[in-house]
């Protein structure tokens, strides 16, 4: 079931020539859908405008999970932070939308997170590391990067 959901989400959000990458990150593949708090979806556009951002959000609101046999109502979280909905029969789609430049900044500021994302094989378009890679994790990253060790 999750493989079908992953494939559906990847193709659903890879709907425009301006979108360079769609990657599903997190534990969706390893868990039952009922045990998943949210589905993390990274979307990288070549250049993100206000109109394209709104187009992605509008497109997301039209998603129909019932078409693939999943009877859950999708709830959107287009913020970069966690947002949990405690509604039964729903699943949170956590859309993290970047353009190439903001993705580069995220790699620089949060190399641990981005390194983890790069390891995902659940993507369409360019691999995240093809857009801008985490070259290596440095000792200083353990202290100064977001999600580093304090």
Predicted regions and their residues:
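Acidic Asp/Glu-based divalent-cation binding sites
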Residues: 38-40
